[in-house]
């Protein structure tokens, strides 16, 4: 089946997919900053493939020249496991962030200090019922959002919504589709989290004493 999505957008075989990208107009101040990779629990029916999927995303993030040092899943959990109070705070922070979109500042400041990362990068994958104009009764929303820990500001986000076809709900197709769409979100993030040429041109017009060069920040 061919479905045309009106916002975002793509003409694709299968379910209807829309991608939205938003972020701050100037991303240069956030280039090459240390990042803590935050993840949620496995969505329904993806428990078996979720650890591998998270691992693949983490590897891709560590390859991005625009990101600084990435504190990954295992390293993060080692720090949290050694500090039960911090782990409880992390769970509260993550729950608030995923349910409301709000970065709770007091908890974020503690996590920023312990994880030594001024930026948080959250992979959020939600499965929920779809009731209007859907090929089936299931839709996914996948977000990869970069947040400044201290301010709680959203720096950059890629959001993909996919309404599943009935034939995409078999176990094999389900797992394969989850990996494919998550990779798509990461690809969109990598292609969008950049500094446009005109921003570099503006930077090069500054006095040499305050100018930032690409080579100085590793991109």
Give the role of each language-model region.
Residues 31-43:
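Short beta-strand segments enriched in small/hydrophobic residues
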Residues 46, 130-135:
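Extracytoplasmic/secreted cell-surface and envelope-processing proteins
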Residues 44-122, 189:
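N-terminal segment of the mature soluble domain
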